[in-house]
Amino acid sequence: MNKIRSLRCLLPETITSASTAASNRGSDGSQFSVLWRHQILDPDSNIVTYWNHVFLITSILALFLDPFYFYVPYVGGPACLSIDISLAATVTFFRTVADIFHLLHIFMKFRTAFVARSSRVFGRGELVMDSREIAMRYLKTDFLIDVAAMLPLPQLVIWLVIPAATNGTANHANSTLALIVLVQYIPRSFIIFPLNQRIIKTTGFIAKTAWAGAAYNLLLYILASHVLGAMWYLSSIGRQFSCWSNVCKKDNALRVLDCLPSFLDCKSLEQPERQYWQNVTQVLSHCDATSSTTNFKFGMFAEAFTTQVATTDFVSKYLYCLWWGLRNLSSYGQNITTSVYLGETLFCITICIFGLILFTLLIGNMQSSLQSMSVRVEEWRVKRRDTEEWMRHRQLPPELQERVRRFVQYKWLATRGVDEESILHSLPTDLRREIQRHLCLSLVRRVPFFSQMDDQLLDAICGCLVSSLSTAGTYIFREGDPVNEMLFVIRGQIESSTTNGGRSGFFNSTTLRPGDFCGEELLTWALMPNSTLNLPSSTRSVRALSEVEAFALSAEDLKFVAHQFKRLQSKKLQHAFRYYSHQWRAWGACFVQSAWRRYKRRKLAKELSLHESSGYYYPDETGYNEEDEETREYYYGSDEEGGSMDNTNLGATILASKFAANTRRGTNQKASSSSTGKKDGSSTSLKMPQLFKPDEPDFSIDKEDV
């Protein structure tokens, strides 16, 4: 005997009884049948929850089906009733299908575990998995109610009881049919309402959206109107049949004319006796609901005959009866004119009471469902009104108020009032990590520096990222201000510019798009082995050109990640950092420009000296020294090429070179005199500041980390 393996590998979220065992089967099909036979389901599993939703919908549709039996009898001729065979067969078919679902629901309850009452002291409680205990508990509680709801009583009444009635089949409007249907509504209601509460307890809601919840409550109200309209129609037919029966009894008592019960059945219309009786009887005149001289009091049921509802086709008949039920249920029966007939009076009282209860429940439930849609909108309106009052109270300038309004509006459009951070923090760590990885991993991988990291550190970075919103015109960083976070752009465009510390005539700008990042000064600061607590200053001004959505990585989190990453040193990482850093790019571009200009000036001076072959080339006068020459040759190599100029431009070129040399020499002399202590206020203004090389991060391994 082998232990049957768990069904978790075949069906998700199902539980197999631990005490169940079976012999080893030869084929997979036999094993699968054994597994299904001994399978015990978790009441909170997805398969049970899905079945509860399906069975709830089926049960409500079955409640809609039963009142259609009331439309089977109709007035088929003068003083006779008939039955709609096609309607009866259609309703019977669908009602049988609904009964099959009830049978399957009984089977599901026999295989669904329950929580032991004694184990509910802490947590969810312990599931009882023994099939015998489950069956005994179910037989003692809900089994009889489920069986009573499953029995095909309306089918038996309409197809067996009424046709087998004595003295013909005239009494098609027998009250037994209505009684059976209404009585069976009781166990079906005992099934639906606890099932509804069980679904809410398991999933938290019966409908996922507010509109679906409102439609569900409205559907229940329409169901009540549907039942009332069908009962009114059947009662009208029954009231008409009662009038015919009373007149027939009077005729038989006087022994003037024989009135057989079969004459009230439309099947006897072709009989000679029936035709003779129709010509001489007073049934038609005494039971005419459209006549005001009729002694029989039809009361509220006369409308069914004055509007010819009893003789029209099924669709028109059903829609009119449904409208009648909606009208009187919503008005609590105030428009009904009744007679002294006891059944009619009780029916009107029932309509009034149920109308008051159901209409109150409908308004309350629909209001709750629809308010859940607008609760965030209302909270946003209140917050926006408070913001407006605060700005007016503090007398903020109009342009600043407009920027605040744009930010509040953009935040609402981006989040719809949902606090994403609180949602993420309420989830387990593993699930939160997976969500952050899904949202941020592809964006972080676009950063070449982070693309060199392993998945573990990338997960750590993704877990530290938080969402950030900026409106157009907002300065994210200002040049010289401390940088406290690094931004990864998701949507929008950002302008990153620098003036090299306010240098006159210097301006460098670039546009950041989705996938780019800014605040790379933090990388250098974080990778320094002995970095201070002071945050680095921003070398660029970063301003949002449009509404920007981004992820932000704080300085503390980046410091932690960078410290962990120092163990994974790579020369490729250093090159990637230099190449993609806007700060290093700006320095490199300026360095190349400066070197190129020096090269062009030196080449021009060489050409002049070679042409004149005397003394117009003075390295000291042009501002170059041996150190500059060695630096240039180190980066660019020695110059071996010469050049020539056109004779027509030679004179102008010589004069220009002399002017430049004199100007440069005067500037150097003033700068040197200022450094030796001479007080000359204009000398410092002529000295041009240099573009400093950015600090290089330390990618080496510390001894203490080894």
From Swiss-Prot:
Keywords: Calmodulin-binding, cAMP, cAMP-binding, Cell membrane, cGMP, cGMP-binding, Cytoplasmic vesicle, Ion channel, Ion transport, Ligand-gated ion channel, Membrane, Nucleotide-binding, Transmembrane, Transmembrane helix, Transport. Changing residue 491 to Q: Impaired cGMP activation of the Ca(2+) channel and strong defects in pollen tube guidance. Belongs to the cyclic nucleotide-gated cation channel (TC 1.A.1.5) family. The keyword Transmembrane helix applies. Homomultimer. Interacts with CPK32. This is Cyclic nucleotide-gated ion channel 18. It comes from Arabidopsis thaliana. InterPro entries: cNMP-bd_dom, cNMP-bd_dom_sf, Ion_trans_dom, RmlC-like_jellyroll. The transmembrane domains are indispensable for pollen tube guidance. Residues 693-706 have a biased composition (Basic and acidic residues). GO terms for cellular component: apical plasma membrane; cytoplasmic vesicle membrane. Residues 661-706 are annotated as: Disordered. GO terms for biological process: intracellular calcium ion homeostasis; pollen tube growth. SMART domains: cNMP (SM00100). Cyclic nucleotide-gated ion channel required for directional pollen tube growth into the transmitting tract. Acts as a Ca(2+)-permeable divalent cation-selective channel inhibited by either lanthanum or gadolinium. Regulated by CPK32 to mediate Ca(2+) transport across the plasma membrane in response to Ca(2+) oscillation. It is a multi-pass membrane protein. Residues 1-53, 108-142, 196-217, 367-706 are cytoplasmic. The gene is CNGC18. PROSITE patterns: CNMP_BINDING_3.
